[in-house]
Protein backbone atom coordinates (compact mmCIF):
# COMPACT_ATOMS: atom_id res chain seq x y z
CA UNK A 1 0.00 0.00 0.00
CA UNK A 2 2.44 2.62 -1.18
CA UNK A 3 1.81 6.33 -1.37
CA UNK A 4 0.82 7.83 -4.69
CA UNK A 5 3.44 8.12 -7.44
CA UNK A 6 1.38 10.95 -8.90
CA UNK A 7 1.85 14.67 -8.44
CA UNK A 8 -1.69 15.90 -7.94
CA UNK A 9 -3.19 19.33 -8.14
CA UNK A 10 -6.37 19.35 -6.08
CA UNK A 11 -9.15 20.46 -8.37
CA UNK A 12 -12.52 19.99 -6.69
CA UNK A 13 -14.09 22.53 -4.37
CA UNK A 14 -14.06 21.67 -0.68
CA UNK A 15 -17.31 22.20 -0.85
CA UNK A 16 -37.16 -1.18 4.34
CA UNK A 17 -40.04 -2.56 5.55
CA UNK A 18 -41.40 -1.35 8.91
CA UNK A 19 -42.83 2.15 8.98
CA UNK A 20 -42.20 4.59 11.81
CA UNK A 21 -45.24 6.71 12.66
CA UNK A 22 -45.28 10.48 12.10
CA UNK A 23 -44.56 11.35 15.73
CA UNK A 24 -41.50 9.12 15.74
CA UNK A 25 -40.33 10.59 12.45
CA UNK A 26 -40.65 14.11 13.77
CA UNK A 27 -38.77 13.19 16.91
CA UNK A 28 -36.05 10.98 15.52
CA UNK A 29 -35.28 11.99 11.93
CA UNK A 30 -33.46 15.04 10.63
CA UNK A 31 -36.24 15.19 8.01
CA UNK A 32 -39.44 13.16 7.67
CA UNK A 33 -38.20 11.72 4.36
CA UNK A 34 -34.70 10.92 5.63
CA UNK A 35 -33.35 7.41 5.05
CA UNK A 36 -29.83 7.71 6.42
CA UNK A 37 -28.07 5.48 8.91
CA UNK A 38 -29.95 6.85 11.94
CA UNK A 39 -33.32 6.17 10.39
CA UNK A 40 -32.31 2.71 9.15
CA UNK A 41 -31.14 1.77 12.65
CA UNK A 42 -34.41 2.85 14.28
CA UNK A 43 -36.56 1.11 11.68
CA UNK A 44 -34.38 -1.99 11.84
CA UNK A 45 -34.72 -2.24 15.61
CA UNK A 46 -38.49 -1.82 15.56
CA UNK A 47 -38.76 -4.50 12.89
CA UNK A 48 -36.92 -7.02 15.05
CA UNK A 49 -37.99 -6.27 18.62
CA UNK A 50 -40.98 -7.88 20.24
CA UNK A 51 -43.75 -5.28 19.72
CA UNK A 52 -44.75 -5.36 23.38
CA UNK A 53 -41.18 -4.71 24.48
CA UNK A 54 -40.86 -1.87 21.94
CA UNK A 55 -44.04 -0.24 23.24
CA UNK A 56 -42.69 -0.18 26.78
CA UNK A 57 -39.91 2.28 25.86
CA UNK A 58 -39.54 5.76 24.44
CA UNK A 59 -36.65 5.96 21.97
CA UNK A 60 -34.96 9.30 21.25
CA UNK A 61 -32.32 9.42 18.52
CA UNK A 62 -29.57 11.94 19.39
CA UNK A 63 -31.65 15.14 19.43
CA UNK A 64 -33.52 15.79 22.66
CA UNK A 65 -36.43 18.15 23.26
CA UNK A 66 -38.34 18.42 26.54
CA UNK A 67 -41.55 17.39 24.79
CA UNK A 68 -39.88 14.18 23.59
CA UNK A 69 -39.45 12.91 27.17
CA UNK A 70 -42.15 10.45 28.24
CA UNK A 71 -42.65 10.48 32.04
CA UNK A 72 -44.50 7.15 31.93
CA UNK A 73 -41.90 5.07 30.10
CA UNK A 74 -38.16 4.51 30.37
CA UNK A 75 -36.50 6.91 27.94
CA UNK A 76 -33.64 5.56 25.83
CA UNK A 77 -31.27 8.11 24.30
CA UNK A 78 -29.64 6.46 21.28
CA UNK A 79 -26.72 8.61 20.18
CA UNK A 80 -25.39 8.83 16.63
CA UNK A 81 -23.84 12.31 16.95
CA UNK A 82 -20.47 13.56 18.20
CA UNK A 83 -19.97 15.20 21.61
CA UNK A 84 -18.99 18.44 19.84
CA UNK A 85 -22.48 18.68 18.34
CA UNK A 86 -24.55 21.49 19.91
CA UNK A 87 -27.38 18.98 20.36
CA UNK A 88 -25.16 16.96 22.71
CA UNK A 89 -24.13 19.71 25.12
CA UNK A 90 -27.01 19.12 27.55
CA UNK A 91 -25.37 15.83 28.53
CA UNK A 92 -22.78 17.77 30.52
CA UNK A 93 -25.51 18.20 33.14
CA UNK A 94 -26.33 15.28 35.40
CA UNK A 95 -29.92 16.49 35.66
CA UNK A 96 -30.34 16.07 31.92
CA UNK A 97 -28.75 12.63 31.89
CA UNK A 98 -31.04 11.51 34.71
CA UNK A 99 -34.01 11.65 32.35
CA UNK A 100 -32.74 8.57 30.52
CA UNK A 101 -32.85 4.98 31.67
CA UNK A 102 -29.82 4.39 29.48
CA UNK A 103 -27.70 6.25 26.95
CA UNK A 104 -26.84 3.96 24.04
CA UNK A 105 -23.61 4.60 22.12
CA UNK A 106 -22.94 3.24 18.65
CA UNK A 107 -19.23 2.54 19.25
CA UNK A 108 -16.71 2.31 22.05
CA UNK A 109 -14.92 5.24 20.41
CA UNK A 110 -18.07 7.35 20.71
CA UNK A 111 -18.60 6.48 24.37
CA UNK A 112 -15.01 7.37 25.18
CA UNK A 113 -15.38 10.73 23.40
CA UNK A 114 -18.52 11.60 25.39
CA UNK A 115 -16.75 10.65 28.61
CA UNK A 116 -13.63 12.71 27.87
CA UNK A 117 -15.34 15.78 26.39
CA UNK A 118 -18.69 15.99 28.18
CA UNK A 119 -18.02 13.96 31.30
CA UNK A 120 -20.74 11.39 30.61
CA UNK A 121 -20.01 8.58 33.10
CA UNK A 122 -19.45 5.15 31.63
CA UNK A 123 -22.10 3.69 33.94
CA UNK A 124 -24.77 5.91 32.37
CA UNK A 125 -24.33 4.26 29.00
CA UNK A 126 -23.87 1.06 27.05
CA UNK A 127 -22.37 0.34 23.63
CA UNK A 128 -24.64 -1.33 21.08
CA UNK A 129 -22.93 -0.92 17.75
CA UNK A 130 -24.62 -0.08 14.48
CA UNK A 131 -25.22 -3.08 12.25
CA UNK A 132 -26.78 -4.29 9.01
CA UNK A 133 -28.69 -7.17 7.51
CA UNK A 134 -26.59 -10.18 6.63
CA UNK A 135 -25.27 -10.71 3.12
CA UNK A 136 -25.47 -14.17 1.64
CA UNK A 137 -22.10 -15.61 0.55
CA UNK A 138 -21.39 -14.63 -3.03
CA UNK A 139 -18.57 -14.46 -5.55
CA UNK A 140 -17.39 -11.15 -6.95
CA UNK A 141 -17.46 -10.72 -10.74
CA UNK A 142 -14.16 -11.64 -12.40
CA UNK A 143 -15.00 -11.09 -16.06
CA UNK A 144 -15.06 -7.30 -16.10
CA UNK A 145 -13.38 -4.26 -14.61
CA UNK A 146 -12.98 -3.91 -10.87
CA UNK A 147 -15.82 -1.84 -9.43
CA UNK A 148 -15.18 0.80 -6.80
CA UNK A 149 -18.10 2.27 -4.89
CA UNK A 150 -18.77 5.41 -2.82
CA UNK A 151 -22.17 5.66 -1.12
CA UNK A 152 -22.02 8.44 1.44
CA UNK A 153 -23.08 12.09 1.28
CA UNK A 154 -21.03 14.51 -0.88
CA UNK A 155 -19.39 16.38 2.01
CA UNK A 156 -17.64 13.32 3.45
CA UNK A 157 -14.76 13.00 1.01
CA UNK A 158 -16.26 12.88 -2.47
CA UNK A 159 -14.11 15.83 -3.55
CA UNK A 160 -10.97 13.92 -2.55
CA UNK A 161 -12.15 10.85 -4.44
CA UNK A 162 -12.88 12.88 -7.59
CA UNK A 163 -9.38 14.31 -7.64
CA UNK A 164 -7.79 10.91 -6.97
CA UNK A 165 -9.83 9.19 -9.69
CA UNK A 166 -9.09 11.95 -12.20
CA UNK A 167 -5.39 11.22 -11.91
CA UNK A 168 -5.78 7.47 -11.58
CA UNK A 169 -7.49 7.51 -14.98
CA UNK A 170 -4.25 8.77 -16.51
CA UNK A 171 -2.53 5.56 -15.38
CA UNK A 172 -5.06 2.78 -15.99
CA UNK A 173 -8.50 1.98 -17.40
CA UNK A 174 -9.32 -1.32 -15.70
CA UNK A 175 -11.81 0.02 -13.13
CA UNK A 176 -15.16 1.77 -12.79
CA UNK A 177 -16.47 3.88 -9.93
CA UNK A 178 -20.14 3.82 -8.92
CA UNK A 179 -21.13 6.86 -6.86
CA UNK A 180 -24.36 7.01 -4.88
CA UNK A 181 -24.24 10.41 -3.21
CA UNK A 182 -26.77 13.15 -2.54
CA UNK A 183 -28.30 15.00 0.38
CA UNK A 184 -31.67 13.80 -0.86
CA UNK A 185 -31.14 10.81 1.43
CA UNK A 186 -31.79 13.24 4.31
CA UNK A 187 -34.55 15.14 2.54
CA UNK A 188 -32.15 18.04 1.93
CA UNK A 189 -31.99 18.03 -1.85
CA UNK A 190 -31.41 21.79 -1.89
CA UNK A 191 -28.01 21.20 -0.27
CA UNK A 192 -26.86 19.42 -3.43
CA UNK A 193 -26.66 22.75 -5.27
CA UNK A 194 -23.42 23.72 -3.52
CA UNK A 195 -21.85 20.51 -4.87
CA UNK A 196 -23.05 20.88 -8.46
CA UNK A 197 -19.57 21.82 -9.70
CA UNK A 198 -18.23 18.65 -8.10
CA UNK A 199 -20.99 16.57 -9.69
CA UNK A 200 -20.20 18.16 -13.06
CA UNK A 201 -16.53 17.26 -12.68
CA UNK A 202 -17.45 13.69 -11.82
CA UNK A 203 -19.50 13.61 -15.01
CA UNK A 204 -16.33 14.36 -16.99
CA UNK A 205 -14.64 11.18 -15.77
CA UNK A 206 -15.01 8.19 -18.08
CA UNK A 207 -14.75 5.68 -15.23
CA UNK A 208 -17.47 7.26 -13.05
CA UNK A 209 -21.15 6.35 -12.92
CA UNK A 210 -23.08 8.86 -10.79
CA UNK A 211 -26.46 7.70 -9.44
CA UNK A 212 -27.37 10.20 -6.73
CA UNK A 213 -29.60 8.78 -3.98
CA UNK A 214 -31.09 5.30 -4.32
CA UNK A 215 -32.76 2.88 -1.90
CA UNK A 216 -30.75 0.82 0.55
CA UNK A 217 -32.00 -2.27 -1.26
CA UNK A 218 -30.41 -0.98 -4.48
CA UNK A 219 -27.16 -0.23 -2.64
CA UNK A 220 -27.06 -3.74 -1.19
CA UNK A 221 -27.54 -5.24 -4.63
CA UNK A 222 -24.73 -3.09 -6.02
CA UNK A 223 -22.39 -4.11 -3.19
CA UNK A 224 -22.63 -7.77 -4.16
CA UNK A 225 -21.16 -6.81 -7.55
CA UNK A 226 -18.57 -4.35 -6.21
CA UNK A 227 -14.98 -5.00 -5.17
CA UNK A 228 -13.58 -1.94 -3.35
CA UNK A 229 -15.10 0.63 -1.00
CA UNK A 230 -13.50 3.94 -2.04
CA UNK A 231 -14.14 6.15 0.98
CA UNK A 232 -11.46 8.81 1.64
CA UNK A 233 -13.48 10.20 4.53
CA UNK A 234 -13.02 13.82 5.57
CA UNK A 235 -15.82 13.71 8.14
CA UNK A 236 -15.43 12.42 11.69
CA UNK A 237 -18.06 9.77 12.33
CA UNK A 238 -18.99 8.07 15.59
CA UNK A 239 -19.63 4.87 13.63
CA UNK A 240 -19.79 4.13 9.91
CA UNK A 241 -22.76 2.26 8.46
CA UNK A 242 -21.20 2.61 4.99
CA UNK A 243 -18.13 0.65 6.09
CA UNK A 244 -20.14 -1.92 8.04
CA UNK A 245 -22.37 -2.73 5.09
CA UNK A 246 -19.55 -2.73 2.53
CA UNK A 247 -17.31 -4.96 4.62
CA UNK A 248 -20.14 -7.38 5.35
CA UNK A 249 -20.57 -7.58 1.57
CA UNK A 250 -16.91 -8.56 1.26
CA UNK A 251 -15.52 -5.34 -0.21
CA UNK A 252 -11.96 -4.24 0.38
CA UNK A 253 -12.33 -0.99 2.36
CA UNK A 254 -9.78 1.72 1.57
CA UNK A 255 -10.28 4.27 4.35
CA UNK A 256 -8.28 6.66 6.57
CA UNK A 257 -7.66 6.22 10.30
CA UNK A 258 -10.15 8.99 11.08
CA UNK A 259 -12.74 9.04 13.85
CA UNK A 260 -14.41 5.73 14.60
CA UNK A 261 -13.31 4.20 11.29
CA UNK A 262 -10.40 2.67 13.23
CA UNK A 263 -12.86 0.72 15.37
CA UNK A 264 -15.42 -0.01 12.69
CA UNK A 265 -12.94 -1.28 10.10
CA UNK A 266 -10.27 -2.77 12.39
CA UNK A 267 -7.34 -4.48 10.65
CA UNK A 268 -9.37 -5.74 7.71
CA UNK A 269 -9.34 -2.39 5.91
CA UNK A 270 -6.50 -0.91 3.93
CA UNK A 271 -6.16 1.98 6.34
CA UNK A 272 -3.84 4.93 5.86
CA UNK A 273 -2.86 8.00 7.86
CA UNK A 274 -5.48 10.71 7.41
CA UNK A 275 -4.36 13.97 5.77
CA UNK A 276 -5.87 17.37 6.55
CA UNK A 277 -4.65 18.91 3.29
CA UNK A 278 -7.09 17.84 0.52
CA UNK A 279 -4.43 17.83 -2.19
CA UNK A 280 -2.06 15.65 -0.18
CA UNK A 281 -4.99 13.44 0.81
CA UNK A 282 -5.98 12.96 -2.84
CA UNK A 283 -2.41 12.15 -3.84
CA UNK A 284 -2.05 9.57 -1.10
CA UNK A 285 -5.44 8.09 -1.88
CA UNK A 286 -4.70 7.71 -5.59
CA UNK A 287 -1.62 5.71 -4.73
CA UNK A 288 -3.39 3.42 -2.30
CA UNK A 289 -6.24 2.79 -4.75
CA UNK A 290 -3.65 2.02 -7.40
CA UNK A 291 -2.10 -0.61 -5.12
CA UNK A 292 -5.52 -1.97 -4.15
CA UNK A 293 -6.43 -2.48 -7.80
CA UNK A 294 -3.12 -4.25 -8.42
CA UNK A 295 -3.50 -6.51 -5.39
CA UNK A 296 -7.22 -7.25 -5.32
CA UNK A 297 -7.15 -10.76 -6.82
CA UNK A 298 -4.11 -11.97 -4.89
CA UNK A 299 -5.02 -15.24 -3.11
CA UNK A 300 -3.96 -14.00 0.34
CA UNK A 301 -6.11 -10.88 0.07
CA UNK A 302 -9.07 -12.89 -1.19
CA UNK A 303 -8.77 -15.17 1.83
CA UNK A 304 -8.75 -12.17 4.15
CA UNK A 305 -11.86 -10.73 2.48
CA UNK A 306 -13.69 -14.03 2.99
CA UNK A 307 -12.77 -13.98 6.69
CA UNK A 308 -13.83 -10.33 6.84
CA UNK A 309 -17.28 -11.10 5.44
CA UNK A 310 -17.78 -13.85 8.01
CA UNK A 311 -16.69 -11.50 10.80
CA UNK A 312 -18.97 -8.60 9.85
CA UNK A 313 -21.97 -10.78 9.05
CA UNK A 314 -21.68 -12.18 12.57
CA UNK A 315 -20.54 -9.37 14.85
CA UNK A 316 -22.32 -6.57 12.95
CA UNK A 317 -25.50 -8.46 12.08
CA UNK A 318 -28.99 -7.53 13.18
CA UNK A 319 -29.32 -11.08 14.51
CA UNK A 320 -26.70 -10.41 17.16
CA UNK A 321 -27.68 -6.80 17.80
CA UNK A 322 -31.40 -7.48 18.23
CA UNK A 323 -30.56 -10.10 20.85
CA UNK A 324 -28.36 -7.60 22.71
CA UNK A 325 -31.08 -4.96 22.58
CA UNK A 326 -33.64 -7.44 23.88
CA UNK A 327 -31.42 -8.35 26.82
CA UNK A 328 -30.81 -4.69 27.68
CA UNK A 329 -34.44 -3.60 27.42
CA UNK A 330 -35.80 -6.60 29.31
CA UNK A 331 -33.53 -5.79 32.23
CA UNK A 332 -34.40 -2.08 32.16
CA UNK A 333 -38.11 -2.86 32.05
CA UNK A 334 -37.82 -5.04 35.13
CA UNK A 335 -36.00 -2.25 36.98
CA UNK A 336 -38.55 0.33 35.87
CA UNK A 337 -41.55 -1.80 36.85
CA UNK A 338 -40.09 -2.37 40.32
CA UNK A 339 -39.94 1.35 41.09
CA UNK A 340 -42.72 3.12 43.01
CA UNK A 341 -45.10 4.71 40.50
CA UNK A 342 -44.33 8.12 41.93
CA UNK A 343 -40.63 7.62 41.13
CA UNK A 344 -40.09 6.81 37.47
CA UNK A 345 -37.05 8.98 36.92
CA UNK A 346 -34.35 10.09 37.66
CA UNK A 347 -33.04 6.60 37.13
Residues covered by each model-derived region:
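Active-site proximal beta-strand in glycosyltransferases
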Residues: 57-87, 101-105, 126-128
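Nucleotide-activated donor-binding/catalytic signature segment of Leloir-type glycosyltransferases, i.e.
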Residues: 192-214
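A charged, aromatic-enriched C-terminal amphipathic alpha-helix characteristic of glycosyltransferases
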Residues: 35-40, 276, 280, 297-340
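Acidic donor-binding loop of glycosyltransferase active sites
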Residues: 224-238, 251
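Donor nucleotide-sugar binding/catalytic pocket of nucleotide-sugar-dependent glycosyltransferases
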Residues: 101-115, 120-137
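N-terminal pre-catalytic "stem/leader" segment of glycosyltransferase-like enzymes
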Residues: 1-66
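Conserved donor-binding/catalytic core segment of Leloir-type glycosyltransferases
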Residues: 140-157, 162-165, 169, 178
